[in-house]
Amino acid sequence: MQPIISFEQFNFQYKHAAQPTVKDVTFHIYPGEKVLIAGRSGSGKSTLAHCMNGLIPFSYEGTSTGTILIDGKDPRKGSIFEQSKQVGTILQDQDAQFIGLTVEEDVAFYLENECVNEDDMKKIVSESLKKVKMHNFHKQSPHELSGGQKQTVSLAGLLTTNAHILLFDEPLANLDPVSSLHTVELIKDIHKQYNKTIVIIEHRIEEMLNLDLDKIILIDEGEIVAIGTPEKILASNILPSIGLREPMYIEGLKRLHFDSNNDVIYPLENLQRESVSGVINEWMEKQTFCKDTPTKKELLKVENLSFSYPNKQKVLDNVNFSLFKGEIVALLGHNGAGKSTLAHSLIGINKTKNDRILIDGVNINSWSIRKRGEVISYVMQNPNHMITQATVMEEISFSLKLKKFSKEEIKVRAEETLKICDLYPFRNWPIQALSYGQKKRLTIASVLTTNPKLIILDEPTAGQDYYHYKQFMTFIRKLAAKGLSFIFITHDMNLALEYADRAIVLKEGEVIANNTASIVLGHPETLKRANLKESSLFKLVKFSGIANPERFMELYFDDIRREEGV
């Protein structure tokens, strides 16, 4: 069988770049395969995707050498229009994908360009939406849809093209666990029905394993460093060495010094249950649990907070909780649970009446949004909704200029924060040249320059690879140690388990859990009620059959925190 995608000793260097972005790349993908191309930010994986779909060389100029064939043809010799018939692409930023004012209009875009007659067009659009179970949303505006629904509509649009290859650029970047699982199942279903070749660009290895991949291609610093089945890749130690995260249960097994004997470490169900339970019980017997924590001063107190949008039922219903100085709290819950509404109420966007929001004991209900912003900062999930300036340095300096800081102070604060957030080398770059993850770090860096008391972060690590995830969260912990408080609105269970001192879970506007993250996320009933996903580590512990899996989770993350000096 001939490969449908073939790279042979391929090199590409962007115009004005000092060196090639991808170097001596060789790999083959065969018809009907499901392949993950993984690497951290800047590794060259997106460049490979652009070579496949024709954005290189037709939108991004540069010099290439070597061989690239898509379905037997060199895409460099055709046109981007011709290439779009072979390779359909779903972008990381769902909002950037939409053109139509309604779902059906957006799905019909390709057909309109092909001058398909109206009757046939309506039929094809209807069939495509039915394939992805979105036919009941055909009249809705894309902006009324959730992230997962937007992703699904984009896929429906691709199905109208009959492209043989479906290319997904970080499809899970902005999705909650339920939507992520839905997207993966949808891709599997499309592959099963139509035998499309699936190529996914991602750094989230664990989530993509649910796709039953045929192989994983790892790229680092522009070079292919490994190609193999998921079993082969996970049995090696290569992922951490190139800044990618292993599944949490594998990290746990290594931390417990588990010997997998015959290298069977994936899938989890293939492990020897007795060996796993033995090493877990042995490890637990050696642990001591430190419950004594230093007394912290209360920063935020929320009492009886309720909120309803006009002509709608309550979105928040009698919410009560406290937040201490230097504390990191994860705010969890399914889409529509009230997480964003709560954040908007804290910063003053939503006006509430019969409640109390106290900062350092002072009721701030009468404060303006601007005054609240001096003590509570909010960072949106989508960085494109926050960035207003043309360059990195202008963006990070913007709020400091509004606060009338001197030029010298602005320069010192801006450069210091850029270095901490690993953005200093890009300080003079135009915003449009940044990746999504870099833009995310920039919005957070901009907030940090003004020294608020509490920062609310909406999906702080979305769009960031594991290297920058670890680096950024280490930085957040250092800030917390100095007394700065954080609330994370997140769907990332690993983030909550590893870095949150506490987890608050919302369901239909009510607080249904408020405890340490290990206790909350080790409680099956809470996970089920809130539509949250079990971590693979918790699945491993349940698989082992030990008597008290919740106890293990507490001990495990307590041990990590003590080791890191938290």
Swiss-Prot record:
Bilayer topology annotation: Peripheral membrane protein
SMART domains on file: AAA (SM00382)
Domain ABC transporter stretches: 5-246, 300-533
Enzyme class: translocase
Main location: membrane
EC numbers, comma separated: 7.-.-.-
A GO term from the CC aspect: ATP-binding cassette (ABC) transporter complex
Residues annotated to bind ATP 1: 39-46
Stored SUPFAM superfamilies: P-loop containing nucleoside triphosphate hydrolases
Keywords carried by this UniProt record: ATP-binding, Cell membrane, Membrane, Nucleotide-binding, Repeat, Translocase, Transport
Binding site for ATP 2: 333-340
Molecular function terms, GO-annotated: ATP binding; ATP hydrolysis activity; ATPase-coupled transmembrane transporter activity
Subcellular location: Cell membrane
Gene3D superfamilies hit by this protein: P-loop containing nucleotide triphosphate hydrolases
Functional description taken from the UniProt entry: Probably part of an ABC transporter complex. Responsible for energy coupling to the transport system.
Recorded family membership: Belongs to the ABC transporter superfamily.
PANTHER family per UniProt: ABC TRANSPORTER ATP-BINDING PROTEIN BC_2655-RELATED, HEAVY METAL TRANSPORTER
Protein's name in the database: Putative ABC transporter ATP-binding protein BCE_2668
